[in-house]
């Protein structure tokens, strides 16, 4: 079928389908009215078993890569002109959530050896193996009817006894304190990301523990660094975690401050984290945080939010969390005690080996980078 004809047909039927390619996950994301679900299922089936291979377009792309190999890419130009983008890219490199920029370019030999048939064969082998494949269907529909339609299409996939296996090297965070700056034009202020990375065992309880740790740190950033000491502007902490395959996480404490305050901020951050390692948090504070988790979950996941359900369920899969644990979310959350959190702070955080990336016109005295 001509591509434009298919596109027009899908538009009329309100069907959309796109590929989702991430560092360690591949799949499809599709949406359609319930009445057109069989057509969506058949479209996915055809895509994985009989994809259209456009050799002419593939060759054009290859030649374009060869011609522009030694030229600066648009992304590289954007990075050089935007220190904050450089900083974000460096965070991804140092925490294992992205590839090093130096590894992203293919050599001329690698480009010449690219083969569309080999690429298609890899994806066909990946997508047509039911072992290790998970389908997530969310929406307002009759489950029995939809499952019959689903099975009538995907039940045709031959059974395989072989699970697709891929090996991933264990990601190692910097083994010592790493401090690196990027230039900006502000004479008096430093914008910084103070990163605390580590490895964890995937599972809902450990994920909730990390989220509680994040919010406990946030409370102290606001009360100590901003309200009591007035050292930072708009302090914020985020948590990134990736359960499968690496089991990695990092806390990112982000704020801006006057240049002269940076040494004091670093010392106070260490004191805050040291206190959380040594003392159990107050039950009242912990229970307040737990209630906020339950309220947020109730508000986000309801009968009118299929996309939120899809995001939540796919997140469980990617982070090694089970549906049964999620069914007992409240009990799992309630089981986390102040003593467990104190132990988690001790186990997960090394306050001496951290990553500090910053934007400043002035280089910090303790900068450990080579530039």
Describe the residue ranges of each PLM region.
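Short, surface-exposed beta-strand/loop micro-motifs that present aromatic residues
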Residues: 121-125, 175-183, 344-347
